[in-house]
């Protein structure tokens, strides 16, 4: 029969174990604290326009404000179409790092807000990121488990026969049931460092999900703005085609009366064909844009609902010359890179601890008797306490090279973190400049479109009165058509710059699922 040596029960043994466990508070390896590398402010860079140009842009802004009180006369191109609504007064961006940049501050179109909610709820990439969070949360829980004693229960039954020297063999039955405890004392912090690394992995994937959501919201808003731009472009092309058709009919009437040549008529026909061709082009692009937006929504290709006009989709903002660098530091991609670096630093500690002795304690307690009905009686009590020390002496360089690899990975992640910060600064600077200078471009484009609208109206009246040639009308209408398309494109680019600014500063979508 297997024998177990009885040892005196003493509370001193547990006191010793508790004292040894306190020594595990130390942890080898570098600190996981990270010094932020973001500057105190994020600059927009040197202003791209000289002071004289700035004075000119300011004068255009004042002129546009005065023009709103006296609408320009309509040309034949603009007759019958809804008036062009200017972009509203921009709001001031909050530069306080404690301010939560919410997308709901700038998304004014309820239809766009609904589309974003649908995308957040349905997008497969976001579902993948959220599933990874659950995966790494479980892995973190598994990494924390070794902090605690591992308890197992065992039961066995056997029939034994042993031979004794000079005697008859002995047969006996043995039934035992024991509870076993094993505990690795985290003297060097190997388990602690592993749990830290798992926690940083979890935080990294949480930031990855935030980055996926941030990109998704930005992409939906950008695609929707482009869709609304195509709607406006189609409206302009159709209005221009209809107006050109009216002028063409007038030219044909004059040709029939012998007042103009066939060349004039052919020129007008070519003029009308241009917006007609562009109309078909815009229709194709609009269908492709709806399909792209449907993909972001996690839905099959189909029609996309529309809200208000392009100018009302996004709230325009004004920005200062610089913003606090803390706005950059809270971007999810920057936070993710920081967490990856911290996880690598923690794994250096794991690799270092693997080269040091491992201290374990354990024991078992149970009962062993020949008959099952006599288990757990005082006569069958068995128990033991053990302590072990394991020291790696020769591993063929495996542990040393694992430590070297961990340090190299930490250097890699540190460089990646620094590169991510530089990329974030560049994107923020580009977005700041895009918003600031996009406003100037928009004002100039609005001024051009208004001036050409007046010029086209004058040219049409002069041609109808017979005091000017068809070339004057053709030139004025073509210039107006191009200016109107450019204005819509600039409006879309300006509002998209606002979207990119919120993305560059790590804006949050607080309307998720609501």
Where is each model-derived feature located?
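Terminal intrinsically disordered/low-complexity segments used for targeting and assembly
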Residues: 2-6, 10-121, 175, 199, ...
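Gram-negative outer-membrane beta-barrel proteins
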Residues: 28-30, 36, 159-165, 187-189, ...
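Sec/SRP-type N-terminal targeting helices
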Residues: 127-128, 144-145, 185-213, 263, ...
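Transmembrane beta-strands of outer-membrane beta-barrel pores
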Residues: 135, 157-161, 185, 297, ...
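Hydrophobic, lipid-facing positions within transmembrane beta-strands of outer-membrane proteins
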Residues: 175-183, 223, 323, 383-387
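Periplasmic alpha-helical coiled-coil/stalk elements that build and connect Gram-negative outer-membrane
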Residues: 191, 200, 207-323, 434, ...
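A short glycine-centered flexible hinge/capping loop motif at secondary-structure junctions
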Residues: 255-259, 463-467, 504-508
């Amino acid at each position: 029969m297997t024998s177990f040596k009885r040892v005196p029960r003493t509370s001193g043994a547990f006191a010793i174990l508790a004292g040894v466990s306190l020594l595990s508070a130390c942890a080898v390896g570098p600190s996981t604290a990270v010094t932020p590398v973001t500057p105190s402010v994020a600059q927009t860079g040197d202003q791209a326009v000289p002071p004289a140009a700035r004075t000119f842009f300011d004068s255009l802004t004042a002129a546009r404000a005065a023009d709103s009180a006296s609408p320009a006369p309509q040309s034949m191109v603009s007759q019958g179409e809804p008036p062009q609504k200017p972009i509203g007064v921009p709001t001031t961006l909050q530069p306080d790092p404690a301010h939560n940049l919410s997308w709901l501050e700038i998304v004014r179109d309820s239809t766009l807000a609904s589309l974003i909610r649908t995308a957040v709820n349905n997008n497969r990439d976001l579902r993948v990121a959220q599933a990874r969070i659950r995966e790494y949360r479980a892995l973190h829980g598994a990494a924390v488990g070794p902090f605690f004693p591992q308890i197992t229960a065992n039961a066995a039954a056997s029939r034994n026969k042993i031979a004794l020297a000079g005697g008859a063999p002995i047969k006996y039955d043995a039934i035992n049931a024991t509870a076993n405890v094993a505990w690795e004392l985290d003297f060097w912090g190997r388990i602690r460092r592993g749990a830290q690394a798992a926690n940083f992995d979890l935080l990294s994937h949480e930031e990855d999900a935030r980055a996926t959501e941030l990109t998704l919201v930005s992409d939906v808003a950008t695609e929707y703005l482009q869709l609304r731009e195509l709607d406006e472009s189609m409206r302009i092309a159709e209005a221009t085609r209809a107006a050109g058709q009216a002028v063409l009919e007038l030219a044909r009437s004059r040709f029939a009366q012998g007042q103009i040549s066939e060349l004039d008529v052919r020129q007008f026909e070519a003029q009308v064909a241009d917006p007609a061709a562009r109309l078909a082009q815009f229709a194709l692009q609009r269908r492709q844009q709806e399909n792209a937006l449907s993909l972001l929504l996690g839905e099959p290709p189909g029609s996309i609902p529309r809200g208000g006009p392009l100018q009302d989709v996004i709230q325009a903002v004004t920005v200062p010359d610089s913003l606090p660098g803390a706005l950059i530091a809270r971007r999810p991609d920057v936070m993710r890179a920081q967490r990856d670096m911290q996880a690598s630093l923690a794994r250096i500690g794991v690799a270092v601890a693997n080269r040091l002795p491992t201290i374990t304690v354990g024991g078992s307690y149970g009962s062993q008797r020949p008959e099952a009905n006599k288990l757990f009686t005082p006569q069958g009590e068995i128990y033991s306490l053990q302590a072990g020390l394991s020291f790696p002496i020769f591993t063929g360089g495996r542990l040393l090279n694992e430590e070297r690899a961990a340090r190299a990975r930490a250097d890699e992640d540190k460089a990646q973190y620094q590169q991510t910060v530089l990329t974030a600064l560049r994107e923020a600077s580009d977005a700041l400049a895009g918003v600031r200078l996009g406003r100037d471009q928009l004002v100039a484009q609005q001024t051009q479109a208004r001036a050409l609208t007046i010029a086209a109206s004058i040219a049409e009246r002069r041609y109808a009165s017979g005091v000017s040639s068809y070339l004057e009308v053709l030139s004025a209408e073509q210039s107006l058509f191009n200016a109107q398309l450019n204005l819509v494109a600039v409006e879309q680019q300006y509002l998209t710059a606002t979207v990119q600014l919120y993305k560059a500063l790590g804006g949050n979508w607080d309307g998720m699922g609501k």
